[in-house]
């Protein structure tokens, strides 16, 4: 029956039986099928099945191609039983159920139309009608947005496919279908009788009649009326004389009550926000559907509406799932009859709200202290019981704890008359608390005690309503008008200094004192109402406002100042009550309104509104013009883009929300009569007008000379009589004759190039400052490129909404909707990027961001036509842009100042020296860090200096941003941690301060200046070697003796300490971040920012209050106890260098615990210092004398013998002992149960943006397999079971452990430079082919190379290109664990390797393309570049034979970790450029970009889904080649490969041979900051590539596999039988033939000693290894069968084994 798609309830009327009857029925059917009643029941079932089959055969079949689950198929048949649905399951697409449902709904609508009548399809499904031959239907398909364009293209492709099938004979077309198909023959995109791209209102395809458009009498609309206003629909139906429209639309009646809810039948949801309603589908990557809420509500309510003498009547006739099917009738010439409020919503059934009531609850917004209301849905029984209980409490019992206790105890089970009744829907715990508070307040308000208390409070206070404060506010508004007048009169830019209107703290209460009323300040909601309404009525009294105008003005003010009105404020006069659901719905449906008032003529409403606004404006202008003859209320201000926003005039100016009294404060000085106030106030305004007239001409002339970037009005505030002005005087920004720009916005130009290096002058101070400006400008350009790249990707749809963990902290703000499209993780950015679409390239502006409760409230310039603005990490702080603006105006002559350096060890008292030697009243004191600056200010304050210390002691950034006008100068400049700053910054500080002497505190061995732009080469960044005087300090007051012992190795002179602590440092080994010890109040220090983020999240999750900083951030600070943490096992050459080691170990005074996942130089130093005796440590105290130290030196000689035959010697014991000597303890570790223990014990994982499906755990450990038992015990891991937990572990340790090392990079420039180098160094330009790749022969060749299984999967998938989700990937894990050749297997549980791959259909699209591209790359590559792709050992040896054994080479190995996961947007763009170089089409490039940007991975087997950005997918169509290209490009960018003799690369492995003595800089820092690669550089005596040593023999170079890895793999525990072992033997024997040469064996012995730090000789073990490899009989002795018996070598089919082993056999 399941195959027939029938449900059991359809076979018999089971639903009409009682529960007992159903039980008997199933018992007889299942337990007694042979009894008479059972047989009768079976016959009934068979007859019923036959009847249903016959009935279905009479129906026309409806073919559903979408892939649906069995549950969805059953649901579809249950909702639409009238159709004979045939499921093909050959079209996989997003929200397939909804797509299939639309076809059936379209047929339902068409069935309502007479068979021979013409039909207009509004927003129609014309491609569906073509397949059914419905030639009477004309579809109006307007392209309103990009989604409609995409659908139109999809339909055209579908139509083309139908034609192709008809021509090939695969499809038979009916006569009607052929007619409809012929309409598209001339031009598929042109309008025709079948469809047009006009709106229903604009469609003229049926011609005209009497000057009006003709249309069909019937219309249908399938999910398209959302986008049509009801008025437009009615107007069109009237004009085209359409009688009836049948429609279907998603029906969400719950949206009238709650803002968000489910649409269960389509697995979707709705959401109301900002006047819009959103429809979307769960677990769906596509965009949501957005519609106007007010228009949707009209269709939802379905009220009869009259229009131009016609009444439009809504008739809802069926609800199918979440879709309402209804008709709109146009009725002419009859009086309208209204519906009662009970006729519509009473029929709507919402099952989860049955017997529930609506209860208002109240909450207080913590940030604003504003009372808000929301509706809560509670069971009526529960609510009645709670109200009854609270009403019976006495005054002493009426407490919040009692109310909460009762509500909580009855939330799940309600006790009525002693019986327990389970609540149908319990209340959320948070809402339950709010309900308790609301019910308590209701009861307390109802009792007279609270009334007496309120009266007592009101008698003790007196609100202010005098005219004095009112006129104070109005006067400032007048100054705003004058500022606008200056801007208009001078035709200049924005007004720089604004005077505002809205005080942060408004006047609230006053008390009578002998000196007059004393004002108090408080953020009071009530007082805002009093003050601002007083302003309105004061103005109204002057201008004789009419009542309606005044009321409108009051409403405007209330909206502007967020003074809420209405039901959300708790009304104590009307206690809280609840409403029945149906009554609540019915209250929304008003039947008393006439048709004309339900939908008024909008043009008339607009005219009335404009007239009312004009009256308000004229009244406001009347008052201003009466006092100021030059005032013009109609003036329009024109200005360049500004963050200040557009200026208004007239009434708009008076009502504008600004922030002026935040800069001015007023205080009461004396009591003045109202008459005196009014007289002096008005006279003051007249006097001020004369002053303004004098300012305008001079200011306009200044602007015309171009000496300022914007208008700056510097004038005194007008102070009403009785008040004194306490606003500090404003000083202009002037620097040595030049005007310093005060920038409110920055221009962001797309395609900007990095600036050119400045010319070297020969003067260090000049060159350093020029370079500093060059660096700041390069940083600005790189940041602009990153900002515009993010906006470009969002605009093109590469970055989409609905994702997680957006790159660079991206946030996208919709300017029109005033809401976040993509909400950033953090807000309060200093600037916001506002692109300007008027420009040809991607350009725009950075504007100062204005925030309010996490939302942007900027008034963006409309003329730029930007729909969206963005924020990101690059806009969070823009201090360097302001500094660049300020410093660019300064002269760059030589600095006449002497520079001194106090070079001291950590904790030597450099800050103390500043405090003791500096006088902040006359000297300038600067520091590079905020914490250090605050510490200096605090210590100066303790010494009692009379000056304002915060004005004299500053951070360097603050000094350069605010003091370039010469406001802070001194003869002596004290600069703390000067070596952390760029030398040019120090010179600038000395120049601005006018210093003659600069005393710099620093340490040449600690962290120096680190540039944030990787592409610039700085030559003058350091002051080291340029000081006039250097004073060394080698005594530390901070560091204990063991730290002093470590520091003594790195400093000249002897380091001594005053700290009495001897031993302070310990090492604690951890496996992961979960094991980090959590100590409240401790100071945690990490090496990397990524480690800091992990630790901050861990502390927050565990609710531990502690501070976390990086080593760089902690330089210059002191802590008592420090926990130094390393959670990343990979080595970073930047953050783990010597200077970081010194800073990390010298921050504490008492204790340091180093918790690390890996042994490194830091742990080595700590262990060595801990091993020192007390006597050894005593010499590092200040009181001890210096002891002499001696060291011995031994010369090492190595004797090398010539070649000879390899002896056939050695035993298994020799191999085991050699392995134990290399890796002590590895063979003792039994890992066979590791996977089982992990799977069956608790495991705490923290994963971001991961969805898991519970119940997918399967006990795979019960599956028993038999394997051979290895005799040799190595750390070869056991084969793992691929469980859900293993998938999550692998995802966490691999895909979610991506490094984030890249600094600011101008990606466009770096890509261009890299491509230029590729063409000049790697490829022969003459051999590069860029012709199109689309070639049938290439496709067929790729197809023939695929397996039969792959071909079958591709053929079975019949989706078209537009139906494929390219950003969706499959996820799996490998069960084999990669073996390690170190000691980590003893304590580390290795994560399995992950494979992220596309579907076969997508690979079949890209596979042939990339195969051709890679062949073209190999053909064009220079011969000394060796790309290890599909090469055997012999092939690789042949490619390196050209190396001369007589020549001397320097071999360089670069080891990169987390290579796939390091990819970001820059890598993707570079890869696309390489593809384009070799002929990739733009359409394929776009699809590839989309498929690698914002991606979703799904592990179907283990029930897991995650979101990943940009990472190179390990299983897509070009993984290995793309990785290899990235490796080559990175090395090409940072190493002089043009000098290389040989470059061998493949994947993330590389080996480069340079001529001996070639000089180059360590590339690892640049590979990290420019390319985001964690890497290490190796220079061993014997190089290695892809697990093979490159040995130099007497005649050539030769690659030989690493014997240590070979021996490790001989401990493999997953070899099935002797036949499998024979296959391994063939592969081993072939790849390790070089072990038969003793010259190779001896050199391998040296290689092992060099690589693995092995002090012994390995020749005997290598001989034993060759002995067991060269003979299969000997190899069999290394294994036993499952019964622990020896293997029989004779039981092998060698022919079968030979066939199984290919050139690339991997065992």
From Swiss-Prot:
Q: Which GO terms describe its molecular function?
A: ATP binding; ATP hydrolysis activity; mRNA methyltransferase activity; RNA binding; RNA helicase activity; RNA-directed RNA polymerase activity
- Name-wise, this protein is Replicase large subunit
Identify the residues that the record assigns to the Alphavirus-like MT domain, covering every copy: 86-300
Ranges of residues in domain (+)RNA virus helicase C-terminal = 1034-1187
Keyword annotations of the record: ATP-binding, Coiled coil, Helicase, Hydrolase, Methyltransferase, Nucleotide-binding, Nucleotidyltransferase, RNA-binding, RNA-directed RNA polymerase, Transferase, Viral RNA replication
Where does the record place the (+)RNA virus helicase ATP-binding domain?
872-1033
Give me the ranges of the annotated region Helicase: 901-1155
Q: How does it assemble?
A: Heterodimer of a large and a small subunit.
Region of interest called Methyltransferase, as start-end residue ranges on this chain: 65-425
> Where are the annotated coiled coils located?
601-622
Question: Which parts of the sequence belong to the RdRp catalytic domain?
Answer: 1449-1562
